[in-house]
Amino acid sequence: MNQQLTVTKRNGRKETIDLEKIHRVITWAAEGLHNVSVSQVELKAHIQFYDGITTTDIHETIIKSAADLISEETPDYQYLAARLSVFHLRKKAYGEYEPPALYDHVAKLVDMGKYDSHLMEDYTKAEFEELDAYIDHKRDLNFSYAAVKQLEGKYFVQNRVTKEIYESAQFLYILVAACLFGKYPKSTRLDYIKRFYDASSTFKISLPTPIMSGVRTPTRQFSSCVLIECGDSLDSINATASSIVRYVSQRAGIGINAGRIRALGSEIRNGEAFHTGCIPFYKYFQTAVKCCSQGGVRGGAATVFYPLWHGEVQSLLVLKNNRGVEENRVRHMDYGVQLNKLMYSRLVQGGNISLFSPSDVPGLYDAFFENQERFEALYVKYENDPSVKRETVKAVELFSLLMQERASTGRIYIQNVDHCNTHSPFDSEVAPVRQSNLCLEIALPTKPLSNVEDDEGEIALCTLSAFNLGAINELDDLAELSELVVRALDALLDYQDYPLPAARKSTMNRRTLGVGVINYAYYLAKNGVKYSDGSANGLTHRTFEAIQYHLLKASVELAKEQGRCPSFHETNYAKGLLPIDTYKKDIDSVCEEPLHYDWDTLREEIMEHGLRNSTLTALMPSETSSQISNATNGIEPPRGYVSVKASKDGILKQVVPDFLNLKDNYELLWNIGTNDGYLHLVGIMQKFVDQAISANTNYDPSVYDSGKVPMKQLLKDLLTAYKYGVKTLYYHNTRDGAKDDQGDAVQVPEEDCEGGGCKI
């Protein structure tokens, strides 16, 4: 009966459906794949055909039929579905499967205003032809289905209203490289472009959403993370809100430091008025964050930071929970609570914590970040001064409230500000780190603005990327990859536009980069080691030592060629201090691996030539971009062998890499047991990583007799993280018993970092 059905062609003509042609396309897509059945895909699709069906609907039906068959037993359907999608998308973009010549493609899209016109000005036709001959369009067939759907939904240059798509993946990769290396000398730039194209299109380097979707278009803002500090004045609060709007509209995730704002009831103008407290201003920031969608890709998101000893802390800790009324809740932002050794020692010793308004205790707020001994002396002095207004709470009660809110919302984060400043690339006396970003992996200096155009203030930006550990055969491969990624991201800093002077000045002076990793869980499985039992400690130490060493080396080489960053003198590197000198020595008790690289020679080179970049590493979450590389997310263990991600492009199934061979080696999140092994690994990584790490804590209430996670356990893990030098804690995940056991882990999309922000 199917023979009689008609199909409506793209040009509107009707003809009899050609099942043989459909068979040929599916057979082509199945070539070389393991355990997939062409006839099963055909059968599943045929049932859904109807008379007059359009060519597009036929294609989409076949793709969906293949995607529905993805499972643990038959993981290769993810490649069959992907190849069918690639075929379909190329037809949509080019009218045929074969891509056009690169030069013609770029000329057309520049003419349409979709690509940046500098591409036609910077490169000759002959150069485009040389690059075109180098492109390998067959690499499109290495994507998984989840990757193609992400490319289609988020990354390809398109008209988001009419859903027209204008390009395919290999053009995306080569043009990102061409934009970044456009100002390099003609004699070397094509070589860099080809090498960077190879590294990114074979998934060795993973690029963040803002770069993948934005570089080659006329909108030039690609920093994933923006850190804005607010002062304790109305002018500064207004400047902060305006800065938020400016950056949220350009695809960035925001970290806001609101810790200086004075507490409720504090005096204003010597008592002429009393202060309304933090909450009305947090609401103002929330409105600013939510007023724009991020470049049409997703809604804005922010994390707000404040110290545990802030006078209003008990009202601030509950802002996200579901109790309370609209007036005393600000639920649509996340919060980062700042701690240090003095706060922890009050907890351990069963003491009290005194809460102050920062405006009542001169010098205390700055000392909290700049100098721990000075902070403690001032804190005790103010506690003993009866003229200073304060509230006293039992440390255990305050910490319990903090951990209870972290557990119930999952989104109250932790920043250990002493670790962020003692084990930092920056000299804390001149450039203290006073906040983090949306996802807690960035630790950069900021200064409050007095108005939006103020260039005395400092807005920190971080430009991200990651190494795919699963695609690296030996650690020395990192030497070339580090050179490529440092050169590309450093060039990006000069290539992009800066909406605000405070951001431009800070970035030009510090030139901060954050290179992380993806596919760590696959890397452990491939090497036969686990999160939980310490077997991965040595490998992790060797790997992260190599990453930091090669990135620093690449930045020194670039400094020799293009000069050190102007604020190099504000770094600890300028004093000859390296991460291996300042890390928390407690970590040596869980990992005895020696250093394998020549750090002393590197130290001398840095002292002599400086660094091009003040920071080089940050370990970010990578939900979206790890799907492109078919990798596991960041440093996280997978929740299931098949993850089912709900996104606006429908349900995406993704199977962990090399599942059939490594099934027994993967350790799933809820099989790990305690957080100890994971936190030890994060501590080992943090020894080398110069910024911070988005590290999560995970709890399964069903393993405890009461069915609840004891407070004692939550506090123990918090102290373990502190002990081993962990700078920040991101999500608190609680197992809710949803489908995890069946190997399929269903993940709902997150409203914040989903798709970029300061994830990659």
Where are the model-predicted features located?
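Gly/Pro-rich turn-and-neighbor structural signature
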Residues: 164-235, 375-405, 409-414, 544-604
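Function-dense linear segments that define catalytic or interfacial modules
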Residues: 157, 171-189, 193, 197-223, ...
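Internal maturation/activation junctions in enzymes
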Residues: 482-504, 508, 529-622, 693-694
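Polar, glycine-rich mid-to-C-terminal structural blocks
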Residues: 318, 327, 331-409
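Core nucleic-acid recognition elements
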Residues: 1-3, 13, 36-174, 178, ...
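Catalytic alpha/beta core of large soluble enzyme barrels
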Residues: 124-150, 440-446, 489, 493-494, ...
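Terminal amphipathic helices with adjacent charged low-complexity linkers/tails
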Residues: 77-110, 149, 339, 420-450, ...
